[in-house]
């Protein structure tokens, strides 16, 4: 082994020895609600080195939605944690030899692809320093599902639309509830291309998280059913669509 090769190997060994693992915890919190965990399919988390573009870790949050009282009801002082041991989390151990800027991307809930949202944030990883509760990314929106949507109809008919609307963590919505749908606007619409044909309010059915409305069919051809929900207080929104063929 020549002297140059030996020096290169020693240099490589030294750089490797300088690297040390930093444990990272990432949680995804539904906006105005609880943690996105196993019950909703979790949220995908990807941690990327900003400078090199190399993915350092990836996985899915697993665990429960957390403590409702602690997250939603109990007044908190500055810096007080809302994390409990059961709260859904993605854990990773990342080897770094120097402070490294990373981007954390989260998308979910994975069990409901029609309602998936994505958020990202940048952080610095510092060797020898771990964040006690980890990083929490806030995921906006609702999960909305169309229930038994018709595929065909005739002009002049009335289309019954029904949806299930929950928070991104799966928490229920209802009038006067903790997640109060009285402050939401929920509407059903029929579209033909870029033209809205008809619209109706969606009303609570009496069954938790379920809403329905009747939309008149005032056109023929290939239409699109659309239901949207908006909470102007929190900024949460959701849209679901389905095709409708009208003869």
What is the role of each PLM region?
Residues 37-44, 99, 176-186:
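Short coil-to-beta strand junction motifs in C2/discoidin
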Residues 66-90, 205-213:
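Aromatic sugar-binding surface patches on proteins
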Residues 124-168:
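Short, compositionally biased P/S/T/A/G/V-rich stretches that sit at domain boundaries
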Residues 27-37, 164-179:
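Short amphipathic, basic-aromatic surface patches that mediate peripheral association
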Residues 51-58, 191-201, 236-237:
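Surface-exposed loop/edge segments in extracytoplasmic proteins
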Residues 13-16:
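N-terminal signal peptide c-region/cleavage motif recognized by signal peptidases
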Residues 96-117, 230-239:
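Short acidic/polar inter-strand loop motif in beta-rich domains
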Residues 95-98, 216-222:
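Surface-exposed, short loops/turns at beta-strand junctions within beta-sandwich domains
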């Amino acid at each position: 082994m020549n002297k140059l090769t030996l020096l290169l190997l020693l240099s490589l060994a030294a750089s490797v020895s300088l690297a040390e693992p930093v444990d990272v915890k990432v949680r995804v919190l539904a906006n105005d609600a609880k943690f996105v965990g196993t019950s909703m399919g979790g949220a995908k988390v990807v941690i990327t080195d900003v400078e090199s573009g190399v993915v350092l870790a990836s996985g899915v949050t697993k665990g429960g939605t957390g403590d409702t009282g602690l997250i939603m009801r109990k007044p908190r002082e500055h810096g007080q944690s809302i994390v409990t041991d059961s709260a859904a989390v993605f854990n990773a151990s990342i080897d770094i030899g120097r402070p490294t800027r990373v981007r954390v991307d989260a998308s979910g809930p994975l069990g409901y692809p029609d309602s998936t949202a994505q958020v990202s944030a940048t952080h610095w990883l510092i060797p020898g320093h771990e964040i006690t509760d980890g990083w929490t990314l806030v995921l906006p929106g609702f999960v909305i599902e169309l229930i038994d949507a018709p595929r065909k109809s005739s002009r002049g008919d009335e289309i019954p639309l029904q949806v299930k609307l929950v928070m991104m963590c799966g928490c229920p919505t209802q009038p006067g509830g903790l997640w109060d749908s009285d402050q939401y606007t929920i509407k059903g619409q029929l579209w033909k291309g870029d033209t809205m044909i008809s619209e109706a309010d969606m009303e609570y059915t009496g069954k938790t998280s379920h809403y329905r409305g009747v939309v008149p069919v005032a056109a023929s051809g290939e239409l699109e059913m659309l239901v949207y929900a908006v909470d102007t207080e929190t900024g949460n929104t959701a849209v679901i669509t389905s095709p409708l063929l009208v003869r």
